[in-house]
Amino acid sequence: MSCRSEHIWIQPITGSRKTSNLCWAIILFLGSLGFLLVGTSSYLGRNLISLFPSQQILFFPQGIVMSFYGIAGLFISSYLWCTISWNVGGGYDRFDRKEGMVCLFRWGFPGKNRRIFLRFLIKDIQSVRIEVKEGIYARRVLYMDIRGQGAIPLTRTDENVTPREIEQKAAELAYFLRVPIEVF
């Protein structure tokens, strides 16, 4: 859902707050919590989970391994929850023809460079470029070629877009910025 007028185009960017990331974080948390509870049950010799008796799983070696997997899964799950709450990769692209500026903003990890803010003059934009790699893992990425800066990606590399969608995005952006389109 982008906001567009005659002179300004603001395009929001979805970061790590995607449904798939949320589903993986929930599944990983519940699975690793289950592993940790089973490992702890085998250590204590009591049923913390009533699905099966704790006597069926020996603490050494199965209980230790399950506890280790549970702890490792909780660490990975907490990493996912942190990236979701910080919205890493989220932000916006603002194209302003009136001021002649392009502003790209992204949220990063907490610290010194939490806010990533790039500014360019529209006159420095050489072209809008589409890079297509076909095959089993097809990839279509939209870039903006900046004079002296190189190519800056505007779409996520893991975003699975159809050729028609990427062409339409590139055509709209090139028309708005009044620059040519290149395909690689």
UniProtKB/Swiss-Prot annotation:
The gene is ycf4. InterPro entries: PSI_Ycf4_assembly. It is found in: Plastid, Chloroplast thylakoid membrane. This is Photosystem I assembly protein Ycf4. One of its GO terms (cellular component) is photosystem I. The keyword Thylakoid applies. Signal peptide: none annotated. The chain crosses the membrane at residues 22-42, 57-77. Seems to be required for the assembly of the photosystem I complex. It comes from Daucus carota. One of its GO terms (biological process) is photosynthesis. Keywords: Chloroplast, Membrane, Photosynthesis, Plastid, Thylakoid, Transmembrane, Transmembrane helix. Its main location: plastid. It is a multi-pass membrane protein. Belongs to the Ycf4 family. PANTHER family: PHOTOSYSTEM I ASSEMBLY PROTEIN YCF4, PTHR33288. Pfam families: Ycf4. The keyword Heme does not apply.
